[in-house]
UniProtKB/Swiss-Prot annotation:
PROSITE patterns named among the record's database cross-references: HSF_DOMAIN
Single biological process term from Gene Ontology: positive regulation of transcription by RNA polymerase II
Positions bearing Phosphoserine: 350
Main localization category: nucleus
Ranges of biased composition (kind: Basic residues): 598-609
SUPFAM superfamilies on file: Winged helix' DNA-binding domain
InterPro entries in alphabetical order: HSF_DNA-bd, WH-like_DNA-bd_sf, WH_DNA-bd_sf
Record's compositionally biased regions (Low complexity): 34-45
Localization: Nucleus
Protein name: Heat shock factor protein
Length: 609
């Protein structure tokens, strides 16, 4: 007799079984109805149905007469099928309406059974002639028929779980898209702030350059005042007189030679008169000549250069001719020494070209004693010879004042570029090695330091100033525009993707104040969406006010000592400007400066006293 799982009640937690007909009876024939099974759970009974397939399978495995074809495993948590062909022919038709073993395996898979693999299944030749198959289910165990109600068929019950997962995925995608859109807006806002800050920085740079130009003009006025102090008796253009602080530099840079056998300053003239040679006559005339009235600031040293400067009053010859005549006619001096000195005068103080600062080397073989020529002698000599014109004074100004490189370079013609030399460079015509390697001087820039011809930015509006004088501003704006366009396209792609998925995206607005406060790139610059308002920021006059008393004092003095042509006009001469990488040419006629405001009345100071 085969005991079947007929009815299991939950009264007292005990199971009651009922006997059924024999397995060989025709009533069994795989048509038993499923019976209700009650399970105990926390004091409340719950009725569940046992499926027909699980009931038939349990009876089939428990039948001891078919143990040669199907039986329980040793552990009782699975069953074994031995010889599936014989099992399909002899056992399956008794419980099911078919004898197809493949259909039986498919039903097992539908009810949650899985095949247990064995080692012998992977070999070519097994030990047993019949193939052994094992199937297991966690709820299908020996002597536990109460678990059969848990053996259910896989239905569409798992679909709600999948739908919930799908809905969860859609919500996740929606939140992620919203976060991406917020990040895109953050980047767009940050780029806008960077663009405004960049424009503000460029504008501040322009203001600083304009302020530096004004400082340069003030320094020029101060230098004119200081130069007027050294005028010897008559009103001369202050640009032709060198400050005293720079004379010492030229005294060290331009040494000359004096003969060792130089006669005394108190020596008497040669009694031979006309019978003496030309050289002694020249020396005698030089020694007997007294300095002129205008030689107030000339050197008091006794030397050939001093005597020459004191006695030189002719405009018919250049300084080179007189120096050559004085030195070549002197007995005991070599002609090559005079030639070297002529070359040095020609190449270093020639008014026709930019000054060369290579120091000439002295001929050590000469029997000469090197002495330093006073800087005032050189300048007064050139002044008396009228060899320095107003246009050529600018080429000498780097020597006199030794300014650093200007921030406003001018256009150089081919001839000017040819004459532009570098300080400390070795020339083919001049000996090298006289300038120490530690002296790292900058190249001479042909900048007009003694005139107010530096370019003015005041005649341009803010946008034109940034475009004309700062090509990097346009490049920065172009790069920022490309980044902004890329972010806009990404935002459009995100919106299109959200529309395809049917996900509504919010505006994603950000608190600008909070973002600006927490932003690490906040430079405390003016934050504004209006670019024009930033570009039109008025310059800060607190740094260098026009009402500075020292500035006004020097302005008054400079106006008194400046040349007439430099103080009358409000517009300076045309000076074509060529800034690095400048794309647009600047019209020199636009380079005008607004008329300076009225200088306030000169206050009483100790300078006039």
């Amino acid at each position: 007799m085969i005991q079947t799982a007929s009815t299991i009640s939950s009264n007292g937690g005990t199971n009651q079984g009922m006997e059924s007909s024999s397995a060989n009876s025709p009533e069994m024939n795989g048509t038993q109805n499923s019976m209700s099974v009650g399970m105990s759970g926390s004091g409340s009974s719950q009725n569940r149905k046992i499926t027909q397939f699980s009931n038939k399978l349990y009876n089939m495995v428990n039948d001891s007469s078919t143990d040669s074809l199907i039986r329980w495993s040793d552990r009782g948590d699975s069953f074994l099928v031995i010889g599936h062909e014989d099992f399909a022919k002899l056992v399956l038709p008794r419980y099911f309406k078919h004898n197809n073993f493949s259909s039986f395996v498919r039903q097992l898979n539908m009810y949650g059974f899985h095949k247990v693999p064995h080692i012998q299944q992977g070999v070519l030749q097994s030990d047993s002639p019949n193939e052994l198959l094992e199937f297991a289910n966690p709820n299908f165990q020996r002597d536990q028929p109460e678990l059969l109600c848990l053996v259910t068929r896989k239905k569409a019950g798992s679909q709600p779980v999948e739908e919930s997962n799908t809905s969860l995925d859609m919500s996740t995608i929606s939140s992620e898209l919203q976060n991406i859109r917020i990040q895109q807006m953050n980047l767009s806002n940050e780029l806008s702030r960077i663009q405004v800050d960049n424009a503000a920085l460029w504008q501040e740079n322009m203001e600083n350059r304009e302020r530096q130009r004004r400082h340069q003009e003030t320094i020029d006025k101060i230098l004119r005042f200081l130069a007027s102090v050294y005028l010897d008796g008559k009103q001369k253009p202050p640009s032709k007189v060198m400050p005293k602080s720079r004379r010492l530099l030229l005294e060290a840079k331009y040494p000359t030679v004096s003969p060792t056998n130089e006669p005394s300053a108190h020596s008497r003239p040669s009694p031979q008169g006309t019978t003496a040679n030309s050289s002694s006559a020249s020396i005698s005339s030089l020694h007997n000549t007294t300095p002129d009235g205008e030689g107030k600031y000339r050197s008091v040293q006794n030397g050939r250069a001093l005597n020459y400067v004191s006695s030189f009053n002719s405009d018919s010859h250049s300084p080179k001719d007189y120096i050559s005549q004085s030195y070549t006619n002197e007995p005991g001096l070599k002609k090559e020494s005079a030639d070297s000195f002529n070359n040095s005068i020609d190449s270093y103080i020639s008014p026709n070209q930019s000054p060369n600062t290579d120091v000439p080397s002295l001929n050590r073989d000469d029997t000469t004693d090197p002495k330093v020529v006073n800087t005032g002698d050189i300048i007064n000599m050139l002044d008396d010879a009228n060899s320095i014109e107003g246009s050529n004074m600018n080429s000498l100004s780097p020597l006199l004042f030794d300014y650093p490189n200007s921030l406003y370079p001018v256009n150089n013609t081919s001839s000017e570029q040819h004459h532009n030399s570098y300080r400390g460079s070795v020339s083919n015509s001049q000996p090298s090695g006289n300038l120490s390697e530690s002296t790292n001087l900058q190249p001479v820039q042909p900048v007009d330091y003694m005139s107010n011809s530096n370019p003015s930015y005041g005649s341009y509006n803010a946008e034109d100033q940034l475009t004309n004088f700062h090509p990097g501003y346009a490049m920065d704006q172009k790069r920022i525009s490309k980044l902004s366009d890329g972010i806009t396209k990404q935002d459009q792609n995100i919106q299109a993707l959200a529309d395809i998925l049917g996900i509504p995206l919010g505006d994603g607005k950000i608190d600008d104040a909070g973002f600006s406060a927490n932003s690490p790139t906040n430079l405390n610059l003016p934050v504004s969406s209006d670019l024009d308002s930033v570009l039109n920021i008025p310059p800060n006059e607190d740094v260098f006010p026009d009402s500075n008393p020292v500035f006004d004092e020097f302005t008054n003095i400079s106006n008194l000592t400046s040349p007439i042509e430099a103080s009358n006009g409000n517009t300076f001469g045309s000076n074509p400007v060529s800034l690095p990488n400048q794309q647009k040419s600047v019209n020199p006629s636009l380079m005008t400066v607004s008329s300076p405001r009225q200088v306030r009345k000169k206050r009483k100071s100790s300078i006039g006293a």
